[in-house]
Structures are given as structure tokens and as C-alpha cells.
């Protein structure tokens, strides 16, 4: 059993929009033999679209909107990739994905360096001590000086770095990378093929000069000396603790430097790690199955109105058609057709091990954070909802389709696309999101998947705070006094909707015994 778990590698690829995350995912799948031709992302000349972007709206805009799950075998390893959306409006989905992975690859654009989105996501990795590998992409275009990039990575992401490959120039002068880890030179030919020319070179001989010319050879030698002098030696323990990040350079679109990244990754990345539950720590090699739902997706197949709950197996072995306990409902369920994914294509699986991600058919029984076990009462920690940044009233634009609209809103909220609050004062539904793009996605999906039309009406709100108090009388007084600001979330918890920072401050000062929370995880 342990051998099966040991060979699992489950990781997420995160980055700022357009740093080349989906291109990197495609190339990894190409090496895993999962796709024959990578769909050149967003190019209009080639009418293929990326494998991991499967929703209509993703294909139209050339961006990733939801996390895709893909798995393949590489050498002796079983690899599960989660490709996450980088657009900040979909950050909620990404935060939750990070709870289901054992390590992370961060993609950084060589010309732009570290951007805001990457910083935010890195904070979540730090909270969980997730091991990180950094891939500096687009070296075939003009890029910043590699030493400046390393300084920026250390400063912005608060982590020590150690380059394991090193670029020779960038842009039109880009010659390739030197693989410090294996002491080989990889020469660059711009093409979309899987082959790169690898040469074993002793860098202290003239062999190097013959390949890249004397001036560049001299420069490379002095840079490598500097790297050894300045950066800490690469120790796997430091990487696994989340204290040191190895750095690779390359060009995902031209498929260059990707194989080095993958080969090193499967060697050093952690197999499934223990997961914290409220009751205890769950180890992956325990004999009994446990797992939690970290994401729900409606309509992977547009012909059937079906939902799929993505479940991360935390320990033991999941077997098809075996009864498992759904802890929140306290009822036993069996799954006759659990699936594994290649973005939209899915295949039925008979068994899955710790570290795997399986899709369970869902007709409304699952919520994000639900736990499945063989009978034990367990609750896994840490799938927070953050207080939304933007709010709008959602109104029905076609009274004949009320039922479809309500069903659509329910399913989309189960997915965690946005949050729904019901105003206690007037009973109207308020949708809260992390960004403007989500409103468009909700409207588009309601119309195209549920045949329901909605319209948005503005509402001026500053923050949604979940409230609680040890003094029930004070809580009641607060709710009566602030009646026009009170709402309920989908779980029926009390939420205070402040329409300005001043209103929130005054409420906090007037009611000292009430706790105001900005995430739903408390």
C-alpha cells in the first residue's frame, strides 16, 4: 500500500494572469503522453484551445476560470496537476485548491517579475508550509537580469531561493540553460517539439566555448561561481519545510526547460502529507479511507445537468461501490461511478489512493469542506470563505423561469463561485464576489446552463462580517438595532453587512462583546 502512496505527486500550478501557467500545464501533459499536440493558448491562427480550459467562457476569453484537475503517469510516478485560474476574480477557487495539494509550482514571467496575485497566493502557501518550486517563464523574450529576478523573488515572496538551472542570455540572444543540478548544457532551438539538444559539458574546458562562444562561456563561468558563493546549497529538507525554493528558467510555450523541471520535481516533491482535522492529524498511510470535498463543479458535461464533487483522498484507499459515511449528513453513501479527470474527459475508477483526486457524482448532497470516512466522525480544517469585495442584488429578469433561476443560483453557490446573502430587512438576495468578472460569469452561466435570465442591481456595501457573541442577549440587541444591516448566509449564520468603514467601526465600538470575523472559518 505504501508504494502506491509514495509514487503520488499532487500539486497546483499558480501564477499571475498571463505568466504562462496554462502553457506550462499543457507541456507537462505532453511529456506525460496525455495529449499529442498542445493547444496553443489564445492563438487565433490555430483553432485549438487549451486542454485545461474547458468551459465555454474560458475558451472565448482565453483565460482559466475554474480549477481543472488532470492526472497522468510519468516514469514510475502518478501525477495529479491542478491548474488554477490566475485572474484575481477567481482567487477563492485557487485558495481552496491550495488546501488539496502537497506542493506548488509558481510560474513567474521573466519580464514582469513577481506580481500582486503571486504574492497573495504565496501567503496561503506560507500559512500551510507548502513546498514551492519556481519556474521563471518566457526567457525566449527580453527578460530582467536573472540575479535581479532572484533578489525580487526572495524579497517579494519572503523565501530563500536557489537556482537549479541558469539561463544564458534572454530574448533573441537566448542560447539555452545550464542545468546546475545535472551539470549539463541544454541548447535552445525555438520549436514546439519535445526534443531539446542536451550536451554534457565540463564547463572548465573549451568544450563550452565551442558551443556558445567564448564571451558567453566566460560570463557563465563567473555567474556560476557567484551562485555557489551567494546562494545556500540546495537541501531537500529545507525545500520540504517550505523554507527554500529551487528556481528553474525556461520557456513553456517553446517547451524549453520544462522537462528539467518535471524530472527534478518528481524526484524532490513530497508524496502525500498528513492532513490536519479538528479531531486529530490524519496520516496518508492509515489503512482506513478519509477524504474531503474541496470543490464542486456543475456541468462538466453540458448535455447533462450534473454536478461533480472533487474529493481529495487524505488516507487509505477509496474503493468503488463501498459504503462510506458522509459526516455532515451522518448517512452512508456508496458511489457506483467515481471518476478521474483529464480536464473535461473523465474515466471511471475502481480505486484511488491517498493523494489522488476523484470526482463523485453530486445531486446536491455535498458542500465544500464535507468529509467522507469509513465511519469515524472527522472534520477537516481550513476551507475558508473570505469576505467578498463586491456586492450586487440579483433580480429575476424572467418571472416564468423563477424555478430555474433558484436552482442555478443554488448550484453555482455550492461550487463556491460566489457567496449568497439574504437581506433580513427586505428579503432580497445579495451576491458577493471577489471581483467584477464573477458577476459576468454567473450571468453567462445562468443563461447558458440553466436557461434563466438575471439582472444586477447596485448596492453600496463595504464589508460582510460574520458575527458571534458569548452573550446571547447582546447579540439579540445588536440584531434588533442593526436590523437594516443584517443578513443570513447559506448556512443560516448571522452576517452584518456594513455599508461603510465608519458604520463598521462604530458597531465594533458600541458592541464590545461581539466578535466580527472577515472569513467564515472561525
Question: Which sequence ranges carry the predicted segments?
Answer:
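Structural and coupling elements of P-loop NTPases
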Residues: 1-522
Amino acid at each position: 500500500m505504501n508504494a502506491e502512496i509514495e509514487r503520488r505527486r499532487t500539486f497546483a500550478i499558480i501564477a499571475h494572469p498571463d505568466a504562462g501557467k496554462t502553457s506550462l500545464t499543457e507541456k507537462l501533459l505532453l511529456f506525460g503522453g496525455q495529449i499529442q499536440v498542445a493547444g496553443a493558448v489564445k492563438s487565433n491562427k490555430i483553432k485549438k484551445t487549451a486542454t485545461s480550459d474547458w468551459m465555454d467562457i474560458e475558451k472565448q476569453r482565453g483565460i482559466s476560470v475554474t480549477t481543472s484537475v488532470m492526472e497522468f503517469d510519468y516514469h514510475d510516478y502518478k501525477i495529479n496537476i491542478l491548474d488554477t485560474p490566475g485572474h484575481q476574480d477567481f482567487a477563492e477557487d485557487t485558495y481552496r485548491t491550495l488546501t488539496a495539494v502537497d506542493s506548488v509550482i509558481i510560474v513567474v514571467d521573466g519580464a514582469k517579475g513577481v506580481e500582486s496575485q503571486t504574492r497573495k497566493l504565496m501567503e496561503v502557501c506560507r500559512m500551510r508550509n507548502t513546498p514551492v518550486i519556481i519556474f521563471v517563464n518566457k526567457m525566449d523574450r527580453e527578460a530582467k537580469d536573472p540575479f535581479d529576478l532572484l533578489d525580487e523573488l526572495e524579497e517579494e515572496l519572503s523565501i530563500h531561493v536557489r537556482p537549479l538551472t541558469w539561463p544564458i542570455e534572454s530574448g533573441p540572444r537566448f542560447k539555452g540553460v545550464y542545468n546546475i543540478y545535472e551539470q549539463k548544457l541544454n541548447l535552445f532551438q525555438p520549436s514546439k517539439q519535445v526534443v531539446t539538444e542536451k550536451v554534457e559539458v565540463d564547463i572548465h574546458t573549451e568544450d563550452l566555448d565551442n558551443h556558445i562562444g567564448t564571451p558567453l562561456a566566460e560570463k557563465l563561468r563567473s555567474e556560476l561561481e557567484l551562485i555557489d558563493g551567494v546562494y545556500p546549497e540546495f537541501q531537500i529538507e529545507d525545500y520540504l519545510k517550505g523554507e527554500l525554493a529551487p528556481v528553474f528558467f525556461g520557456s513553456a510555450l517553446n517547451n524549453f526547460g520544462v522537462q528539467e523541471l518535471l524530472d527534478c520535481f518528481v524526484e524532490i516533491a513530497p508524496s502525500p502529507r498528513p492532513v490536519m482535522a479538528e479531531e486529530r492529524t490524519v496520516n496518508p498511510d492509515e489503512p482506513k479511507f478519509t477524504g474531503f470535498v474541496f470543490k464542486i463543479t456543475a456541468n462538466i458535461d453540458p448535455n447533462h445537468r450534473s454536478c461533480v464533487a472533487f474529493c481529495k483522498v487524505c488516507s487509505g484507499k477509496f474503493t468503488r461501490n463501498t459504503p462510506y459515511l458522509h459526516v455532515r449528513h451522518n448517512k452512508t453513501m456508496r458511489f457506483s461511478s467515481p471518476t478521474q479527470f483529464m480536464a473535461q474527459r473523465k474515466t471511471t475508477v475502481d480505486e484511488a489512493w491517498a493523494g489522488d483526486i476523484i470526482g463523485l457524482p453530486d445531486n446536491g448532497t455535498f458542500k465544500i469542506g464535507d468529509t467522507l470516512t469509513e465511519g469515524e466522525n472527522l472534520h477537516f480544517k481550513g476551507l475558508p470563505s473570505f469576505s467578498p469585495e463586491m456586492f450586487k442584488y440579483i433580480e429575476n429578469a424572467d418571472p416564468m423561469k423563477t424555478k430555474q433561476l433558484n436552482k442555478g443560483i443554488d448550484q453555482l453557490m455550492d461550487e463556491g463561485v460566489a457567496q449568497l446573502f439574504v437581506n433580513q430587512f427586505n428579503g432580497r438576495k445579495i451576491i458577493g464576489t471577489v471581483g467584477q468578472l464573477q458577476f459576468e460569469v454567473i450571468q453567462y452561466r445562468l443563461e447558458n446552463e440553466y436557461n434563466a435570465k438575471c439582472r444586477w442591481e447596485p448596492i453600496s456595501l463595504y464589508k460582510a462580517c460574520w458575527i458571534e457573541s458569548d452573550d446571547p442577549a447582546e447579540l439579540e440587541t445588536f440584531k434588533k438595532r442593526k436590523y437594516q444591516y443584517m443578513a443570513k448566509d447559506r448556512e443560516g449564520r448571522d452576517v452584518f453587512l456594513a455599508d461603510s468603514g465608519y458604520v463598521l467601526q462604530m458597531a465594533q465600538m458600541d458592541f464590545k462583546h461581539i466578535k466580527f470575523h472577515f472569513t467564515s472559518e472561525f
